[in-house]
Amino acid sequence: MTLEQMYAAIGGDYKGVMERLPSADFVRRFALKFLQDDSFPNLKKALEAQDAPTAFRAAHTLKGVCQNLGFDALYVPASALTEALRGGTLDGADTLFPPVEQEYQRVVAALKELE
């Protein structure tokens, strides 16, 4: 799978990320680093532990990484979850987290095909 195909498969903004970052090799390298990013596992653990402040930090980090990499289909639900957690409570997290998890799994699967 090419980098552009991977972005299409995940609903990402290939054109936008290519305008922001210097080269396809650079984008590919940083996109693959997403597989080692711990913000999603930290988010999931924090939600399971009912730890709203840690969940907020993890969701905010995930949102930022997705925005920088042009992972738009994951950025949108991660952003919604971040805003819900911003107030320091878990209100709404039970309904907002599943779309984040679904899109995260889709991104991870596509990135593994890119390797």
Predicted region positions:
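Two-component system phosphorelay core
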Residues: 1-57, 61-115
